[in-house]
C-alpha cells in the first residue's frame, strides 16, 4: 500500500436527459457488455412507466424507490480467536446507494415480465410502495444486523 496521497473518487458525469448523477450511476450498474445506450433506453422507458403510474416526476419517483431500498446497517465477518462473528456496521452513504441500485437491478433481472424496462418499472414501483424483492433484501440485511447486535463491540 503506497504512502503517497489518497486518490479521490472519480466524478461521474450526470445523465444527459435528467442531469442526475444518481441516475447515471444506475444506468452504469444496469449496463451489460458496455451497451450504454441500450441501458439508458431501458432506464428512461422504465422511469416513464413509473412516472405515469405514480403521478410523480420521473426523478422523484426514482428517489422514493431508492430511499426504500437503501440499507443503514449491514454485517461484516470478523475473525476473533478462531471463530468468525457477523459484526453489524453502519453503511457509508456512497455504499448505501450502490447496494440499493444493485439490489433493484438484481431483483428486476429475476422477475418474469416481458421486457427489461417493464421488469425494472415494476420493481421500482414495488420498491416505492415498500414491497418487492429489493425491499425484502434490505429487510433481511437489517434483520441479520439486529440478530448480531451482541457482537457490535467487535467493530474496527
UniProtKB/Swiss-Prot annotation:
Keyword Ribosomal protein annotated: yes
UniProt cross-references to Pfam families, sorted A to Z: Ribosomal_S7
PROSITE patterns: RIBOSOMAL_S7
Coiled coil: none
CC terms in the record's Gene Ontology section: small ribosomal subunit
Signal peptide segment: none
InterPro entries: Ribosomal_uS7 (IPR000235), Ribosomal_uS7_bac/org-type (IPR005717), Ribosomal_uS7_CS (IPR020606), Ribosomal_uS7_dom (IPR023798), Ribosomal_uS7_dom_sf (IPR036823)
Keywords: Ribonucleoprotein, Ribosomal protein, RNA-binding, rRNA-binding, tRNA-binding
GO biological process: translation
Listed GO MF terms: rRNA binding; structural constituent of ribosome; tRNA binding
Subunit structure: Part of the 30S ribosomal subunit. Contacts proteins S9 and S11.
Role, per record: One of the primary rRNA binding proteins, it binds directly to 16S rRNA where it nucleates assembly of the head domain of the 30S subunit. Is located at the subunit interface close to the decoding center, probably blocks exit of the E-site tRNA.
Alphabetized HAMAP family for the sequence: Ribosomal_uS7_B
Family listed: Belongs to the universal ribosomal protein uS7 family.
Protein name according to UniProt: Small ribosomal subunit protein uS7
Organism: Pectobacterium atrosepticum (strain SCRI 1043 / ATCC BAA-672)
Gene that this polypeptide is encoded by: rpsG
Amino acid at each position: 500500500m503506497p504512502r503517497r496521497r489518497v486518490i479521490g473518487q472519480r466524478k461521474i458525469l450526470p445523465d444527459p436527459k435528467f442531469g442526475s448523477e444518481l441516475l447515471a450511476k444506475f444506468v452504469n450498474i444496469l449496463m451489460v457488455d458496455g451497451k450504454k445506450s441500450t441501458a439508458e433506453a431501458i432506464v428512461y422507458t422504465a422511469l416513464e412507466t413509473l412516472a405515469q403510474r405514480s403521478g410523480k416526476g420521473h426523478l422523484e419517483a426514482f428517489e422514493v424507490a431508492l430511499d426504500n431500498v437503501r440499507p443503514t446497517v449491514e454485517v461484516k465477518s470478523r475473525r476473533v480467536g478462531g471463530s468468525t462473528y457477523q459484526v453489524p456496521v453502519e453503511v457509508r452513504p456512497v455504499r448505501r446507494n450502490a447496494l440499493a441500485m444493485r439490489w433493484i437491478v438484481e431483483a428486476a433481472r429475476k422477475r418474469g415480465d416481458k421486457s427489461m424496462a417493464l421488469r425494472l418499472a415494476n420493481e421500482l414501483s414495488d420498491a416505492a410502495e415498500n414491497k418487492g424483492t429489493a425491499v425484502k433484501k434490505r429487510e433481511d440485511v437489517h434483520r441479520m444486523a439486529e440478530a448480531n447486535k451482541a457482537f457490535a463491540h467487535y467493530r474496527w
